[in-house]
């Protein structure tokens, strides 16, 4: 009887493989970084072959590290950096161009063109997304329009498109299976999230042939089996979800109104809205959380661009701390920020402002301002931005949040988590396993093969490490937040000509 599930977590900077047991405990983990390619300013690429090779290397390596055999693995679940786009030749299996990464801005002119035509409203309505270079649709168009011979090959049905999940599954099955799941499809800007199919009108507008696109399947489903030549046995590939949706699942946010916030370079907050796609009036994205058991569940998503990256800025550019954990130590040396606010709008502001021209500011400085105050204000900015998104989410959904589940690197910072609870006025729950993205992929795969029987069983695996209760008086909380809103106003539209 197979005792484990393997998650392949293909991220923006590294490929990871993690083995989990039945209780959701991590048995072994291995990761490998790969190259970031910057051909021009604002352009970001990855080599798809390097992604595949690094991913398969850690997959084989982690089995060895765990001291188990491939036949001990019940299923493989995949989670991936979303939106990143690969186009490859169906016959040779080779990419015709590098993968265009989600951060890449090269297709901004295509997006401006769609907006000028007024086509953005249609896209918002059908896909739940805002028109932005972030999503896959314009990236596919760019490859077809700019790589020699690509358009002709596509018309002849010789090319395949996929996000990283699709590319990995295709390679794991040696070209037998070309699929994606609902959550990844919903990030392409080509998928109608209400009708649950590729949208012909958008495909026509972007001139992308439908024959390139993968088949869309549930997020928990046996898509196929790994080719015997890879692990020596055939292992079912049975789970697939984009990284943020996988984290929502790994946090057991199964009921409408449950939300998680992942603290990484930026922050991604997702709230489960159940079987209803809630349109956003406040600048959030409406997205598919997952498709399981013949039905699809939706989520609202708010993306904050700079959170953990602001701590790196204190370390690398300002050089006022030596390492990230030190930020907590310094923040605790002072009682408050002495009236200082930091707005880390280094690349503009994401949800709910969507201001590309905002820039970073430090306000409220007086002669008494010390480095501890600036460090503390930078940490606090992460919590304020999270409140901005949460308020938008509550307004859109009409649901009042009971508690916020957290994960990701900065969720280990106790000062930040306590301040987060204080400024939101709701408890913040940190789980024992903060690797919730990989865990979510493992759960989706395990459910499809009966390794876990139900979501109830998974919920029992979710264990709290610590609950942070709000301890700040309402009056103080609102006064601090008013100051933040004032600081954000100073940052807005700064870089506009």
Curated annotation (Swiss-Prot):
Sn-glycerol 3-phosphate binds at residues 12, 82-83, 134, 243. It comes from the Bacteria. Activated by phosphorylation and inhibited by fructose 1,6-bisphosphate (FBP). Pathway: Polyol metabolism; glycerol degradation via glycerol kinase pathway; sn-glycerol 3-phosphate from glycerol: step 1/1. One of its GO terms (molecular function) is ATP binding. The keyword Lipid biosynthesis does not apply. Its EC number is 2.7.1.30. It catalyses: glycerol + ATP = sn-glycerol 3-phosphate + ADP + H(+). One of its GO terms (biological process) is glycerol catabolic process. The keyword Nucleotide-binding applies. PROSITE patterns: FGGY_KINASES_1, FGGY_KINASES_2. Glycerol binds at residues 82-83, 134, 243-244. ADP binds at residues 12, 16, 265, 308, 409, 413. Keywords: ATP-binding, Glycerol metabolism, Kinase, Nucleotide-binding, Transferase. One of its GO terms (cellular component) is cytosol. ATP binds at residues 12-14, 265, 308, 312, 409. HAMAP family: Glycerol_kin. Homotetramer and homodimer (in equilibrium). PANTHER family: GLYCEROL KINASE, SUGAR KINASE. Belongs to the FGGY kinase family. Key enzyme in the regulation of glycerol uptake and metabolism. Catalyzes the phosphorylation of glycerol to yield sn-glycerol 3-phosphate. This is Glycerol kinase. It comes from Caldanaerobacter subterraneus subsp. tengcongensis (strain DSM 15242 / JCM 11007 / NBRC 100824 / MB4) (Thermoanaerobacter tengcongensis).
């Amino acid at each position: 009887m197979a005792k484990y599930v393997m998650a392949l977590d293909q991220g923006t900077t590294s490929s990871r493989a993690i083995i989990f047991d039945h209780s959701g405990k991590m048995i072994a983990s291995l990761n490998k970084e790969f190259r970031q390619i910057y051909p021009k300013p604002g352009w970001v690429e990855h080599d798809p072959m390097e992604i595949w090779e690094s991913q398969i290397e850690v997959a084989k390596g982690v089995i060895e590290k765990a001291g188990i055999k491939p036949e001990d693995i019940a299923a493989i679940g995949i989670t991936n950096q979303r939106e990143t786009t690969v186009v490859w030749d169906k016959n040779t299996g080779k990419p015709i161009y590098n993968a265009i990464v989600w951060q890449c801005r090269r297709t901004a002119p295509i997006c401006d063109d769609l907006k000028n035509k007024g086509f953005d409203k249609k896209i918002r309505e059908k896909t739940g997304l805002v028109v932005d270079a972030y999503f896959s649709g314009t990236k596919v168009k760019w490859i077809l329009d700019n790589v020699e011979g690509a358009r002709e090959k596509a018309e002849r049905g010789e090319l395949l498109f996929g996000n990283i999940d699709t590319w990995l599954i295709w390679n794991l099955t040696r070209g037998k299976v070309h699929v994606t799941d609902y959550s990844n499809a919903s990030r392409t800007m080509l998928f109608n999230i209400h009708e649950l199919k590729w949208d012909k009108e958008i495909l026509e507008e972007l001139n992308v042939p439908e024959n390139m696109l993968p088949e869309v399947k549930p997020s928990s489903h046996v898509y196929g089996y790994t080719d015997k030549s890879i692990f020596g046995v055939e292992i079912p590939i049975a789970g697939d979800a984009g990284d943020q949706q996988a984290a929502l699942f790994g946090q057991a946010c199964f009921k409408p109104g449950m939300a998680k916030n992942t603290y990484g370079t930026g922050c991604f907050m997702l709230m489960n809205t159940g079987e209803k796609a809630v349109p956003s009036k406040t600048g959030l994205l409406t997205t598919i959380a997952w498709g399981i058991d013949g039905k699809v569940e939706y989520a609202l998503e708010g993306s904050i661009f700079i959170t953990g990256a602001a701590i790196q800025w204190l370390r690398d550019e300002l050089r006022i701390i030596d390492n990230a954990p030190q930020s907590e130590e310094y923040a605790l040396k002072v009682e408050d920020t002495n009236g200082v606010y930091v707005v880390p709008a280094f690349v503009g502001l994401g949800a709910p402002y969507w201001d590309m021209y905002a820039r970073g500011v430090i306000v409220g400085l007086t002669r008494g301002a010390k480095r501890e105050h600036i460090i503390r204000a930078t940490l606090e900015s992460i919590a304020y931005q999270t409140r901005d998104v949460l308020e938008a989410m509550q307004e859109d959904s009409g649901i009042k949040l009971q508690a916020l589940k957290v994960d990701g690197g900065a969720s280990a910072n106790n000062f930040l988590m306590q301040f987060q609870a204080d400024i939101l006025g709701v408890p913040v729950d940190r789980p024992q396993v903060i690797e919730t993205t990989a865990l979510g992929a493992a759960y989706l795969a395990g459910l499809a093969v009966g390794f876990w029987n139900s979501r109830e069983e998974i919920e029992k695996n979710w264990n709290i490490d610590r609950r942070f209760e709000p301890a700040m008086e309402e009056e103080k909380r609102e006064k601090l937040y008013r100051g933040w809103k004032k600081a954000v106003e100073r940052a807005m539209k700064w870089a506009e000509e």
